[in-house]
Structure formats: C-alpha cells, structure tokens
Design a protein with these regions (language model features):
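ABC transporter nucleotide-binding domains
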Residues: 1-246, 257, 324-333
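Charged, flexible cofactor/metal-binding loops and thiol motifs
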Residues: 17, 238-333
Length: 333
C-alpha cells in the first residue's frame, strides 16, 4: 500500500528575480493507493496531477510531507536507498510516439530491463527473449511480428501496448497511467483501457490513472477511489461512482458539466454549470482557491481554506463549506 501524507511540491517561478513568485504545484495532498486497487486523479491541465505521478515514480522529489510505501517512510531514506521502492512503481507515459527510442527495435527496447533482471536472478540463456515475447502476448501483440520491428513501423495503439509491456518488465506492483489514451486514436482507446483493467485483474497490480477525462476515469475506476485535484489541492475524494453521480464540490460539478451531451439521445442534468472566469494562475485568494471562479461563492468563502472533510452527511470528503448536491450528469432521454 502507498500513502501520501501532506505531499507538497514548489517550483521556482518565472519572471525577474525581484518579482518571481514560486509555483505551488502540490499543497498538502493526502492519498492512499491500496494493494490491487484502482485510483484516479482527475483535474484540468496544470492542477498538479502529473507532478504527483512523477513523485510516485521517483522522477520528482517532494519538498514537504512524506511518501510511505508498505510502511516505509521515504523521507527517512537517502535517495539511493529509495530506488528499490520506486522500481516497484512504473509509469505508462502519455505519448507513445516519443516514449520509445526510434533507433532501436522493440526487442532491444524490452531487452534492456530484462537483461538486468536476468543478471540479478541468474536466469538461463534465452530467458530474455522468451520473457519479452510473453509480455507482448500479455498486452495483445504478436511477438513474432513486433519484436524485430522499429517503433515507426507500428501504429499508435500498438506502440502504447509496447510501452505497457516495457513497464511490466520489472514486475511492478503499481502502474501509473498518465493520460495513457489521450494521444492515440479514439477508436483504439477502449482497447487500451480494457487492457489496463485486465492487467489489474490478472497480475494483481494497483492502478493509478491520471486524467482530465471523466469518462475514462469512471471506466477504469469503477469500484475504486477518485481524487479531484484543483491547483494542487484535493477538493473532493471518495468512491468513483458516488462522486460522479452525486458531486458535492462546485469544481467537480463544473468538470462534469463540461461533458458533451448527445442531442436527441441524452438530456443534460438540470444544474449544469461552468466557472465564471478562466483560471489566473498568479492569483492567490486568501480563502478557497476556487472562490474567484466559483458560481456559488459567498463572502465567507474568502475567510479560510476549507479542509477536506465529510459535511452534511455526505459519503465522500470535499473541501466546500457550501456544498450542494446537483444533477449535472447527462442522462438518457
């Protein structure tokens, strides 16, 4: 199990030295990824969800809080001692067109991590190729066709399956899928999503899905947990289906209101809404961070930052002092 405890991450700002404001990408984020569970981080671009995924994989360091993996605090470890823990968490990158070395065959791309494992375990000769072929078969590809080919010879969907196979070479316990279907053809997305669901069932791996798409989060996260992130803060957390069917925080309601409705087939929820203004990343309101854009903002929203908690008998946790249950999701007509 992986637990984030008050994770913060701040980057240097842009501009002159005298007027440079730091960028707070994450502001005290708490989360839990259970063994074999499905967790989704959802939010608009720039909310901090990818930074959180990079911290989980060891690509970025956190400057506050702690990351606990199976009871071990990573804050207490030196960077080199964290490597075995991060090896158990593998990233499935967003862009399959740049994630694979174009000068190498798929067989050699998969062989690098497998050769390392073979040396560590004393595997027999021929194991690397056999394991590479097995992993390609696991992700629905023909090994005889794919192994000798270069990335440019494969379609986008096939490349993404190779990226997934490469992540599986080290037998990870957690897969972090960062917008894993956003760069491939719409007609191929469902196949990749179903593959990730099947891998979670077959291998028992935990799945963290990072996305801005409510539909994909719901497809992968059914029966799991959903974290809604806004400007580096979790503003709503709970069961995926509960949040999508009964959103409490206005930001979650705005995200759901942005889902297109098929005219003549669906009817929009009666309370769909959009933010009042575009996001100004430089603004630092004294209270709720969503208050300048919130259609439901009141004067007391500026008093203090609301804590993430259960309010008014809600099942999920949310950070709004004036939650309203609203019907924003499209329904069949």
């Amino acid at each position: 199990m992986i637990t984030g405890q008050g994770i913060t991450r701040t980057f240097p700002g842009r501009g002159s030295m005298l007027r440079r404001e730091p960028v707070r990408a994450l502001r005290g984020v708490d989360f839990t990824i259970p063994d074999g569970g499905a967790v989704s981080f959802i939010g608009e671009s720039g909310c901090g969800k990818t930074t959180l995924g990079r911290i989980l994989c060891g690509y970025e360091d956190f400057d506050g809080g702690d990351l606990v993996i199976d009871g071990q605090s990573l804050k207490a470890l030196r960077p080199k001692d964290r490597v075995p823990y991060f090896r158990r968490i593998q990233m499935i990158h967003q862009d399959p067109y740049t994630a694979l070395n174009p000068t190498r065959t798929i067989g050699s791309i998969l062989a690098d991590p497998l050769n390392l494992r073979a040396r560590q375990t004393g595997a027999a000769a021929g194991w690397v190729r056999e394991r590479g072929a097995e992993l390609l078969g696991l992700v629905g590809l023909d090994p005889d066709y794919v192994l000798p080919r270069y990335p440019h010879m494969l379609s986008g969907g096939m490349r993404q399956r190779v990226v997934i196979a490469r992540a599986l070479t080290v037998d990870p316990e957690v897969l972090v899928a960062d917008e894993a279907v956003s760069m491939i053809d719409v007609s191929l997305r469902l196949g990749i999503l179903q593959l990730l669901t099947d891998l979670r069932t077959k291998l028992g791996v935990s799945l963290l899905f990072i996305t801005h798409d409510v539909a994909t989060a719901r497809y992968l996260g059914t029966g799991g947990e959903l974290y809604v992130i806004y400007r580096g803060m979790v503003v709503e957390h709970g069961d995926t289906d509960t949040i999508i069917q009964h959103p409490a925080h206005p930001y979650t309601q705005c995200l759901l209101s942005a889902i297109p409705v098929l005219r003549g087939i669906e009817e929009p929820g009666p309370d769909r809404m959009i933010p009042l203004a575009p996001l100004d990343e430089r603004s630092q309101p004294p209270g709720c961070l969503f208050e300048p854009r919130c259609p439901l903002a009141a004067a007391d929203c500026r008093a203090a930052v609301p804590e993430l908690a259960q309010r008014d008998g809600s099942v999920q946790e949310h950070a709004c002092i004036h939650p309203e249950r609203r019907s924003v999701v499209a329904v069949s007509s």
